[in-house]
Amino acid sequence: MAIEQTAITRATFDEVILPIYAPAEFIPVKGQGSRIWDQQGKEYVDFAGGIAVTALGHCHPALVNALKTQGETLWHISNVFTNEPALRLGRKLIEATFAERVVFMNSGTEANETAFKLARHYACVRHSPFKTKIIAFHNAFHGRSLFTVSVGGQPKYSDGFGPKPADIIHVPFNDLHAVKAVMDDHTCAVVVEPIQGEGGVTAATPEFLQGLRELCDQHQALLVFDEVQCGMGRTGDLFAYRYYGVTPDILTSAKALGGGFPISAMLTTAEIASAFHPGSHGSTYGGNPLACAVAGAAFDIINTPEVLEGIQAKRQRFVDHLQKIDQQYDVFSDIRGMGLLIGAELKPHYKGRARDFLYAGAEVGVMVLNAGPDVMRLAPSLVVEDADIDEGMQRFAHAVAKVVGA
């Protein structure tokens, strides 16, 4: 079907794109720092961060420079060969974490798919072909492939696609007794987000994660931390596992890892990695020089005291604004999360209306997120300026007033 080449508008989306998204009515065309401009030149303060991706804001000079420099050198070579940016980034991640081996992919879904395949394969070759059970949690989110969406504990995303991968059990989050009730020697892995992002910005308790570590050790199962959303500085530590003092066997990272450029990583120990061999898994684009060069530049900035030590003060500034809004409009029952992954749960009177607040925010020039129908979510740049926080939250207060007065 021929499509007339006219001006690009929001209606163009409905004409040409698969209907799996419901994007905003405006189209962003430019970003700088924590500001976005649309086709009409309207300015927005961005507290959505591309869903916790643009950790250094839009068009950070160091990332732009890394992209331009690498773009003039080598873009893609495939994994028939290796490349210097991937090896440099791999070394940085290993030196900064528990891990001894890393593999790069293109998205959080792919990193988690790799992790789940490795966990099952490791159990098969080291223990038993019947050691296949994966324990995961209600309201979790681990990606959109058939395997990862099945491990995620949200039927609204996984139902309707035919048979799912078998031997996946879901139990309530933060409920160690529920895990104990289903844990046995057939379990190959427990998969958990230290902070459930899509599931409502709910943080695990230290006792829960420590208990999972002990149960995995008792049953020779692997503990897998999905830090796709909460990792790379988001909590104030480089990775959330360091805050909790609980070391996983496998960790996945994406989103902020590339600062806006698609890349993900799965990290593990040398012993666990040795279960794989050439051909066990792979990716055409994973670890390409362009992505790894940008991610390396992002890592060098995020993994600094200047960035990490400033996150709690920025969080408190957001929380102070949210509390002030709640005092004025009586809309939030809980303000939670960690670092700059912030959730504000709506009171019963406003249950199910999170997207109303999101849309109202866009109308007044502030971009926010929801985490389910009842929770507002903020995932701004880790280097967002105080002036941007203040102005953006003032705009959000106007958005709340619009919804409350509606």
From Swiss-Prot:
Kindly tell me the pathway this chain contributes to: Amino-acid biosynthesis; L-arginine biosynthesis; N(2)-acetyl-L-ornithine from L-glutamate: step 4/4; Amino-acid biosynthesis; L-lysine biosynthesis via DAP pathway; LL-2,6-diaminopimelate from (S)-tetrahydrodipicolinate (succinylase route): step 2/3
- Please name the gene that encodes this protein: argD
The Gene Ontology biological process annotation of the record reads: L-arginine biosynthetic process; lysine biosynthetic process via diaminopimelate
The organism named in the record is Shigella flexneri
A further note on this protein reads:
The reaction catalyzed by ACOAT is highly reversible. This enzyme may also transaminate ornithine.
What is the organism lineage in this UniProt record? Bacteria, Pseudomonadati, Pseudomonadota, Gammaproteobacteria, Enterobacterales
Query: What subunit structure does UniProt give?
Result: Homodimer.
Query: Which residue positions does N6-(pyridoxal phosphate)lysine occur at?
Result: K255
The record's Gene Ontology cellular component field reads:
cytoplasm
Designated name of the protein? Acetylornithine/succinyldiaminopimelate aminotransferase
Q: Which NCBIfam families would you find in this protein's record?
A: arg_catab_astC, argD, PRK01278.1, PRK05093.1, PRK12381.1
Which EC number(s) does the record attach to this protein? 2.6.1.11, 2.6.1.17
CDD domains found in the cross-reference section: OAT_like (cd00610)
> What positions does the entry give for pyridoxal 5'-phosphate binding?
G108, T109, F141, D226, E227, V228, Q229, T284
